[in-house]
Amino acid sequence: IVSLAVSVLQIAACTLVGYGFARFEFPFKKFWFAAVIITVIIPPQTISSSLYLHFNFFDIFGIFKATTGSSLNLRGSPIPYALMSATCMGLKNGLYIYMIRQFFTGIPKSLEEAAYVDGCSIFKTFWRVILPDAVPILVSCFLFSFVWQWTDTFYSKLFLGNIKLLSLEASTVAD
């Protein structure tokens, strides 16, 4: 269930970001896309200690600490997976954004222009014209995401701790 939910969140977020990179001009677009590509290159082990501390002492703008006196411990729950996936920081999200962006750059802009002429907004054009064409890449990225989440032991041990999961049990059998 966790793998399915995380995969759906990853694909939803990465599709919006990939479409934005493919179709819109905004300041520092090349810089932000380079930052996305760098996330593919950097191994997750390099940021594991900061992720562990961030989700062990979770606090947004000091709100929880100001109201309750302590921060939230999100370890031991699937919430860190959901937060990372929804904000495009999850496992292999840079790769999915790159793949989806490349697919969207191959779709002719005349399809979008025709939808704009017919009175569609940007979001309606994305939803009714672009997304139906993008089903092949979305299915491919979903399958990649699901399999990587299902077989991931690193993030499972980091975020979930001692919870029994099939991927964690399989890794102990291999040892």
Question: What are these model-derived regions, one by one?
Answer:
Residues 1-175:
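A structural signal for multi-pass alpha-helical bundles of membrane permease subunits
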